[in-house]
Amino acid sequence: MSYPQFGYPYSSAPQFLMSTNSLTPCCESGGRTLPESGPAAPAQTPVYCPVYESRLLATARHELNSAAALGVYGGPYGGPQGYGNYVTYGTEAPAFYSLNTLEAKDGGGSAHAGISPAAAYYPYEHSLSQYQYDRYGAMDGGTRRKNATRETTSTLKAWLQEHRKNPYPTKGEKIMLAIITKMTLTQVSTWFANARRRLKKENKMTWPPRNKCSDEKRPYEEEEEEEEECSQEDAMKSEKAEEPTGKEEKELELSDLEDLDAAESESSECEMRRPFPHPHPHPLPGGGPPPRAAEPPAAAAEEEEEEAAERARGCLKPAAEECEAALLGARPRGCEAKLCFPQGQPLLEAKPRIWSLAHTATSLNQAEYPSCMLKRSGGSAAAAVSAPVSVMDRHQDSPVTNLRNWVDGVFHDPLFRHSTLNQALSNTTVSWATTKGAILETGALGRSVGNGANVLKGQLANLAHQDSSKEFLAFPKAGSKMFCS
């Protein structure tokens, strides 16, 4: 009869000798062999081994009975699956297990008489495979984690009762308690944390608090970690206490930055305007400009007018150069008026305001002119008019004279200095003055006006015949406008 629950294809013959004589050798001849060896196995040499004592056999029998009862060596992992390799020791293995026939008859079935076949087969557990017949591998109930019971926690309660003044076990004490109670180290730490929390709620604290930072909130940490957490919380509290002063310092820094931004914006706005040298006959000893508040009002007004004139000259100089190039390189187009300044061309942004050239040219009130246009009007008019004309007559001169005075004031006479248009305008002005003098002397209004018109036509015709390759500037009509953009 074989026992498939062990996985060994052995017969019911006993495997251990029951003799108490330790000196009697066990001699065997070529007897039975295992089925794996085959029927034609050669005869084996006898092997001598000491006989086991009864106390060793009793212990082994007890362990085999417990292992069979647990069913951990069931049939699914029998000999065909390779489990029998643990008891196979090469080609001479049958010599160890083949017994004498007489001893087999005398003690038949005595070794496994108390073993009953297993009712069910359990799966193979790998964690116990390395312990074949070891008592620690077969007994797995006490080594596994289980819930804490009253029997296990009684030891912890006794330790807590003895250490009411300091219920914080060290790491070594926790390990010792875990071994005694068969609990894990985490379970022991959690139990003590819960016990301390429960005592605090019941107002049964008999120990001083640890800086208001106990391990109830962190039941899985050790004392060293708790102390580190306490130090970190203290550092955080000190940082929070220092936060208001830090905020005030940041606000002060921001206010300083705002002041710097305001100063930079003011300086950038001031840089948009071109600086003008301050004409002062007596500078200060320190080298700085004198204060403007000390100047008289009239001097301040004159200085502002001069600055405006300088700005106007700086704005109109490039436009004058373009106009001169256009007049010298263009072809004659009859009596069409050519605009010297394109309407869409923008001037510099530093110009204080925009003037209308048509309004300035046709205006008879020189008080409306800007200061830059009135600077050289008197001198240029005296140079242009050859005949002696009084101041009252100059205000009532022809439009050519007004336009010439305005052009001289703006362009400083760079354009009409060496051109035929300059001569034509001068002749026209002289003829206009002569005609007006004849009107005043004779009183014949109609004939004088006719003679004046004929003279003007003749002068214009002579101008066209003299230089037909250059343009002349015609007078704008009543509805036309000239722009300086």
UniProtKB/Swiss-Prot annotation:
Residues 142-203 bind DNA. GO terms for cellular component: nucleus. Keywords: Activator, Developmental protein, DNA-binding, Homeobox, Nucleus, Repressor, Transcription, Transcription regulation. GO terms for molecular function: DNA-binding transcription factor activity, RNA polymerase II-specific; RNA polymerase II cis-regulatory region sequence-specific DNA binding. Residues 221-232, 254-269 have a biased composition (Acidic residues). Residues 234-253 have a biased composition (Basic and acidic residues). This is Iroquois-class homeodomain protein IRX-4. Pfam families: Homeobox_KN. Ventricles of the heart, developing feather buds, retina, hindbrain. The keyword Lipid metabolism does not apply. It is found in: Nucleus. Regulates the chamber-specific expression of myosin isoforms by activating the expression of the ventricle myosin heavy chain-1 (Vmhc1) and suppressing the expression of the atrial myosin heavy chain-1 (Amhc1) in the ventricles. May play a critical role in establishing chamber-specific gene expression in the developing heart. GO terms for biological process: cell development; heart development; neuron differentiation; regulation of transcription by RNA polymerase II. Residues 206-313 are annotated as: Disordered. PANTHER family: IROQUOIS-CLASS HOMEODOMAIN PROTEIN IRX, IROQUOIS-CLASS HOMEODOMAIN PROTEIN IRX-4. Residues 282-294 have a biased composition (Pro residues). The gene is IRX4. The keyword Repressor applies. Belongs to the TALE/IRO homeobox family. SUPFAM superfamilies: Homeodomain-like.
